[in-house]
């Protein structure tokens, strides 16, 4: 089935608190902020570790993000990259970063996954 994770460059405790406050504790199977022993994005180490913990290969993983750092992280991990326009950066920045797909709403992602 579909598994969801969050990887943030924000401090770990802050990332977990924000995500669980907004989405609840059951939405994501993994939430990870910056941990001192793991390199920051766009280094792929953390996202590859998370994918492995969730039983996913890079080839079957969508890395969804709102910045050029997110696109670079996904590409560095050999994952499919989706840029979202409702976050930190706009469409042009995501296109320039090389996102495979750019979407304007969460519904577009769900429709893509369901197809």
Residue ranges and their predicted role:
Residues 3-5, 80:
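Proline-centered loop/turn at the N-terminus of a beta-strand
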Residues 12, 16-115:
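Asp-based, Mg2+/Mn2+-dependent phosphohydrolase catalytic module
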Residues 1-3, 89:
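A generic structured-segment signal
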Residues 8-10:
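Conserved phosphate-coupling serine/threonine residues in phosphotransfer and NTP-handling enzymes
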């Amino acid at each position: 089935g579909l598994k969801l994770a969050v990887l943030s460059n924000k401090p770990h405790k802050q990332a977990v608190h924000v995500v669980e406050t907004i989405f609840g504790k059951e939405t994501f199977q993994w939430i990870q902020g910056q941990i001192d022993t793991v390199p920051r994005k766009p280094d792929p180490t953390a996202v590859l570790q998370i994918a492995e913990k969730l039983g996913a290969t890079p080839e079957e993983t969508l890395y969804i993000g709102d910045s050029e750092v997110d696109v670079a992280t996904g590409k560095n991990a050999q994952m499919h990259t989706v840029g979202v326009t409702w976050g930190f950066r706009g469409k042009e920045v995501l296109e320039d970063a090389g996102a495979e797909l750019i979407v304007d709403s969460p519904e577009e992602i769900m429709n893509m996954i369901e197809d």
